[in-house]
From Swiss-Prot:
UniProt key word Transcription: no
Function: Catalyzes oxygen-dependent 5-hydroxyuridine (ho5U) modification at position 34 in tRNAs.
Record-annotated active site: C181 (cysteine persulfide intermediate)
Native species: Bacillus mycoides (strain KBAB4)
Catalytic activity of the protein: uridine(34) in tRNA + AH2 + O2 = 5-hydroxyuridine(34) in tRNA + A + H2O
Family: Belongs to the TrhO family.
Protein name: tRNA uridine(34) hydroxylase
Enzyme class: oxidoreductase
Listed HAMAP family: TrhO (MF_00469)
EC number: 1.14.-.-
Length: 319
């Protein structure tokens, strides 16, 4: 493959035993900094989950070091080309679990997990009858892009998913269940939990949406919108054949794929909105957030009280 861009973004995870996550995190942070990588890596006794960016040479050194560590034998890196770093800083943090499911009786994906489907098999499975496609991500991730026909669970975070499944048991019983997430790590646990709950036909997209979008055969087909990623890029394309925008401007309902955080720091909700809507509504998701004394948009643009009042008046008048 011809090298066209100077940077690489690595996305990876592995369920493996790490004896002392705190000590490992400290040492790993120093190692990443020595390579001048930037990113966010989570470490737990159950394994590692990371995204980091650097030059081709820096990321190659990192991949080599990880492959040479027996704990990470067989780890798979999903690699994107980039023009620059995808992060501002480098963080390696110890956690109690890699993905926040907070089950009383935790799932070990090395012992129980759903069937792995490669992109082509997942593509075929999505078209079968009696199949339910469950998006295992957060609501704002779904709103930016998802597989055609996928169910959006009425939840705000991953840890609410088991309760939602239990509440919708009648709809799901007896169906073939397909589940997917960004890179695969959430589905490893979630699909295992579904199996433990008694669902017999549970499959997961191996390698997640990112792998599906790069597959030369399916080329991201049946995906609408873009894939939300947790770095400075915010979104990456998936469907190589056609681009359908499913995101909608929070204020106008117009097609939109531009995410911003609500300007109220106490809210910080992710909202899809155009630059025009952002200015018109002071980058705030509600009236309460617009008039919040710490509204970051007002501070950033040094708006006077008169300017803010005029903006609020226009909104009130529906202009």
């Amino acid at each position: 493959m011809a090298t066209t861009k100077p940077y690489r973004v690595l996305l990876y995870y592995m369920y493996t035993t790490i004896e002392n996550p705190e000590e490992f995190a400290e040492q790993h942070l120093e190692f990443c900094k020595s390579l001048e990588l930037k990113g966010r890596i989570l470490v737990a006794t159950e394994g590692i989950n990371g995204t980091c960016s650097g030059t081709v040479e820096q990321t190659e050194k990192y991949v080599e070091a990880m492959n040479n560590d027996p704990r990470f034998a067989g780890i798979v890196f999903k690699i994107d080309e980039a023009d620059e770093h995808a992060f501002k800083k480098m963080h390696v943090r110890p956690r109690s679990e890699l993905v926040t499911l907070r089950l009383e009786d935790d799932i070990n994906p090395k012992e129980i997990t759903g069937k792995y489907l490669e992109p082509k098999d997942f593509y075929e499975a999505m078209k079968q009858e009696d199949t339910v496609i469950i998006d295992a991500r957060n609501d704002y991730e779904f709103d930016l892009g998802h597989f055609k026909g996928a169910i959006k669970p009425d939840i705000e975070s991953f840890r609410e998913l088991p309760d939602w499944i239990r509440e919708n048991k009648e709809t799901l019983e007896g169906k073939k269940i397909l589940t997917y997430c960004t890179g695969g790590i959430r589905c490893e646990k979630f699909s295992g939990w579904l199996v433990r709950e008694g669902y017999e036909d549970v499959s997961q997209l191996h390698g997640g949406i990112v792998t599906y979008g790069k597959d030369p055969e399916v080329q991201g087909e049946l995906w609408d919108g873009q894939c939300y990623v947790f770095d400075e890029r915010i979104a990456v394309p998936v469907n190589q054949k056609e681009h359908v925008i499913v995101g909608k401007d929070h204020f106008t309902g117009e097609p939109c794929e531009r995410y911003v955080n609500c300007a109220n720091p106490e809210c910080n909700k992710k909202i899809l909105c155009s630059e025009e809507s952002e200015a018109k509504h002071l980058r705030a998701c509600s009236h309460e957030c617009r008039v919040h004394p710490r509204n970051r948009y007002i501070v950033q643009h040094e708006l006077t009280e008169e300017q803010v009042a005029a903006t609020l008046e226009k909104i009130e008048a529906g202009k």
